[in-house]
Amino acid sequence: MYAIVRAGAKQQKVAVGDVIEIDQVETAAGEKVTLPVVLVVDGETVTSDAKKLDKASVTAEVLGGTKGPKIVIQKYKNKTGYKKRQGHRQKYTQVKVTDISL
């Protein structure tokens, strides 16, 4: 059995026991998080009906926070002396999927 869950602006395929990275969630390590379900596949049965998915839930345990790779942004305008350098590092939360229920 696996499910497609929405975490932030992304959708990810998860099964019980998977460790995934989602956009940062303000919860402490060890707490439980419920992720919204988009689709559930159980063997040959595919559930995508909105009424049935309202009852479905994916529970995950927060393992901790991580950071993504450093991204460097550079801007340059010729002949004007304009230069700009900026960096960004996205924060993620690692979670372990503990239960998928319909």
Swiss-Prot record:
Keywords: Ribonucleoprotein, Ribosomal protein, RNA-binding, rRNA-binding. The keyword Heme does not apply. Disulfide bonds: none annotated. GO terms for biological process: translation. GO terms for molecular function: rRNA binding; structural constituent of ribosome. GO terms for cellular component: cytoplasm; ribonucleoprotein complex; ribosome. Signal peptide: none annotated. It comes from the Bacteria. InterPro entries: bL21-like, bL21-like_sf, Ribosomal_bL21, Ribosomal_bL21_CS. It holds the Pfam family Ribosomal_L21p. Part of the 50S ribosomal subunit. Contacts protein L20. Belongs to the bacterial ribosomal protein bL21 family. This protein binds to 23S rRNA in the presence of protein L20. This is Large ribosomal subunit protein bL21.
